Amino acid sequence: MKHLESQLAEADNWTYCAENVKSKQHLVDIKANVKNSQFATPLFEFSGACSGCGETPYVKLISQLFGDREMVANATGCSSIYSGSVPSTPYTMNEKGHGPAWANSLFEDFCEFGLGMELANEKMRARLVKVMNEAIASDCCPAEYKEVFAEWINNMLDAEKTKELAEKIIPMVEAAKDKCNHCKQIADLQQYLVKRSQWIIGGDGASYDIGYGGLDHVIASGKDVNILVLDTEVYSNTGGQSSKATPVGAIAKFAAAGKRVRKKDLGLMATTYGYVYVAQIAMGADQAQTLKAIREAEAYPGPSLIIAYAPCINHGLKAGMGKSQEEEEKAVKCGYWHLWRYNPALEEEGKNPFQLDSKEPNWEDFQGFLKGEVRYASVMKQYPAEAEELFKAAEENAKWRYNSYKRFG
């Protein structure tokens, strides 16, 4: 950090860049690969999260890919604090004035809250379809209007196509709304022309524990929502309490001697429905897999669940939080965290829906990984007699889980 006074001279430079240096995302396919994705304008920027936070890179990436049509239902927790603390928010708009719509609910009902947003959106779009069909059947609309309305109805679930058609429809109905009641109604509903991308964001405390019943209810609904679980393996915002995502051996509040039972496999549980897209990702370990999983989840016409590994200041990284991305890579390479995707659409093609993206771990590095984080290393200092047994159990659990995934793949 530098003193504010020393940086004031840069304000004019920043203003110049913000006002005159335009986005280059129209020059590339931002969804094609990792490099291209970073030409997209971030619609989540300058959050107040801890330095090196493992959560915010995922939120930023989603805003780059879908932010101009994104709706977010956010659980209470770290992600709600850095996303919506008065008087500022890191969510912003692009040059067209489009950006994410964000709202915050509680630990226990954030998924239901997001489902409600999706159901309301469905209802309003159904009303649009009804009005357009009435316009097509009426005599008050010109033939070219009817043609565009019919094209929208046939493509209303195609995000890019609805963007294209919205740019045609809005000026048409605005020009005719004083003469045509159908056009007036469509003009009033114009914000629903573009297919929205509904995201539900929460931490592991909300998703694995307090709000799990709601999460299960929402994915069981079959509705087209995307749930992002920012898995820090503790209740981060409330001070590092143990959750069902906390692995064996880790010290956390309410598990001061090291947790004694294994981590809940939320992702694998969700796959049992058979119609839920599920992915487990770690950006620092495999950026391409992260991008692919997020794109597949959003494109899947049903519920999706993405579980993202997020190093946290509560972990006590000995290398420092500036190395959080590298810590994710270490976690995957040693077998602590595993990368995989479950895509029900593949089963419809006669393929295995489960894809294990992690390579065979280097298990020799597992214990070293644990000792590189204070949440584990503290067990060795405070409970040396039990540390070896707990760390051995942690490694055995990780091997058991990886071997289970191998059998599915």
Regions found by a protein language model. Name each.
Residues 1-36, 98, 145:
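Non-heme iron-sulfur electron-transfer modules
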Residues 2-4, 75-84, 285-287, 309-316:
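A glycine-rich phosphate-binding loop feature that marks nucleotide/adenosyl-phosphate handling sites
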Residues 54, 58, 148-182:
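Active-site diphosphate/adenylate-binding microenvironment
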Residues 1-5, 95-154, 310-409:
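Flexible, low-complexity linker and terminal segments
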